[in-house]
A protein has these predicted regions:
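Charged (often Lys/Glu-rich) extended helix/loop segments that serve as interaction or gating elements
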Residues: 1, 269-428
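The start of beta-strands in P-loop NTPase/AAA+ ATPase cores
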Residues: 34, 56, 126, 178, ...
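Short beta-strand segments
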Residues: 37, 127-133, 181-183, 221-223, ...
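Short acidic, glycine/serine/threonine-rich loops at helix termini
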Residues: 47, 70, 90-95, 115-118, ...
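Solvent-exposed alpha-helices and their adjacent loops that cap or buttress functional pockets
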Residues: 70-73, 95-98, 120-124, 147, ...
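Active-site loop/helix belt of alpha/beta enzymes
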Residues: 134-295, 384-386
Length: 428
């Protein structure tokens, strides 16, 4: 930390790879694709680590396609989701390799028309998966901002329109229907809603097949959203779920997969590959945000610890009211003598607040914000003129890579030069 300074994200690549191996073992030899959600953490060393374990990539932009390809993910292992793909982004997806990416996940009838037009213009045949809105509301499981499968969400084709969409794709010489997909939301704390989404997808595929449609289907995609425990110790590996699918801590991702795989076989769809799209569950527990303590402040009502990392570095607490554990780096916390301190950042917003945590009476010189490996750096900004944090990558306890910190002078110079020599007109 002394070399990199703070704020700094640190990731354990070996632990991330172990998560992938555990997850893939849960398929028990069945055909599958673990499409890592690049939006969770788009750092090259992380993507290369999951790719080396056989993962593909779930991308949501043309830029993420470039990153995935640049990190060695084969085009056929890339699926592209998103409700508003630009023409240039569609072109990029279609131009990859010999046949384009594995699947463009179309989310509306209008998008089907656009993908067909771009494929025609490029002389390509697009592999397409229809993303279904499953009508499963998980807002009692997760934050409303990351619940994506309910009827009022912007995502996916309505269940009532999926058959029409599938026939539309199959009627086109430029399109090939290869999958049916859905996604309920992120940070799911129980298996039940995930299984509900899977049953919707499997039911639709069964209906399509009975109607003579979907003969070229290669996979079913039940999305990601496997939750982690942000508030206590990470859940035990291979922890068995409760009988009703709920648990005091979220089940392991492998438990989700085993449950949905059993449902897939029960539905008579064992001939299709099963695709899942994990992000958070692979990387969040194995990343921390290191922050220096600037000072303490004690008022009549609150003990404050003010750190140099803020909502510009880790937005989740401000955006989702998320809680991350904060622990001192230089000593253990003695529960018998710990005091409750409110940990806050330097940004000029009251929402720049990491919550109350037990810390020593004499605050530490630095802290670690835990479980910060997902949706941390990828959501960071330079708000309040605070340059992006550094990222460091660790394997086997050794530093294997790091990014460079942008100093404030460089940031200021870029902003000063923005727009060239444009000056306001003189007032007369």
């Amino acid at each position: 930390m002394h070399e990199a300074g703070t704020p700094t994200y640190a990731y354990d690549l070996e632990a991330v790879a172990a998560e992938v191996r555990e997850m893939r073992a849960a398929f028990e030899g069945g055909a599958h694709l673990v499409a890592y959600a690049v939006k969770a953490n788009s750092a090259g060393p992380v993507i290369r680590a999951v790719g080396a374990e056989g993962c593909g990539a779930d991308v949501v932009s043309g830029a993420e396609i470039l990153v995935a390809l640049g990190c060695g993910i084969p085009p056929e292992r890339i699926v592209y989701s998103g409700v508003a793909k630009g023409d240039g982004e569609i072109d990029r997806a279609l131009a990859c390799g010999e046949r384009g990416i594995g699947a463009l996940q179309v989310e509306s009838m209008e998008e089907i028309d656009r993908v067909e037009a771009r494929a025609c213009a490029l002389g390509r045949r697009a592999r397409v998966s229809v993303r279904v809105n499953p009508g499963v509301d998980v807002t009692d499981e997760t934050h409303a901002h990351i619940a994506t499968g309910h009827d009022a969400a912007k995502f996916g084709v309505s269940r009532d329109d999926v058959a029409v969409a599938a026939r539309r794709v199959e009627s086109s010489k430029q399109l090939e229907l290869v999958g049916i997909s859905a996604h309920a939301g992120s940070q799911l704390s129980s298996i039940g809603p995930y299984l509900e989404v899977a049953r919707v997808v499997f039911g639709i595929v069964g209906d399509l097949r009975r109607a003579g449609c979907g003969r070229a289907l290669a996979f079913v995609d039940t999305g990601g959203g496997f939750g982690i425990d942000y508030g206590a110790a990470p859940p035990r590996r291979n922890k068995a779920p409760e009988p009703d699918g709920r648990s005091s801590t979220p089940p392991r991702p492998a438990d989700f997969i085993r449950a949905v795989r059993a449902e897939q076989i029960k539905s008579g769809l064992g001939d299709l590959a099963l695709c899942v799209e994990p992000g958070r569950s692979l990387v969040a527990p194995h990343g921390v945000l290191l922050a220096g303590v600037i000072q303490a402040k004690v008022t009549r009502t609150t003990r404050w610890v003010m750190i140099d990392a803020g909502m510009n570095d880790l937005l989740r607490p401000a955006l989702y009211q998320a809680r991350h554990r904060v622990v001192p780096l230089d000593r253990e916390v003695d529960p018998a003598h710990a005091l409750t301190w409110r940990v806050v950042g330097p940004v000029c917003e009251s929402s720049d607040d990491f919550g109350e945590h037990p810390l020593p009476p004499d605050p530490p010189g630095a802290v670690a914000i835990l479980d910060a490996g997902a949706y941390g750096y990828t959501m960071a900004s330079t708000y309040n003129g605070r340059p992006l944090p550094v990222e460091v990558f660790i394997r086997g306890g050794a530093l294997v890579g790091r990014t460079q910190r942008v100093n404030v002078e460089a940031w200021a110079s870029e902003r000063i030069a923005a727009g060239g020599d444009a000056v306001p007109p003189k007032q007369h």
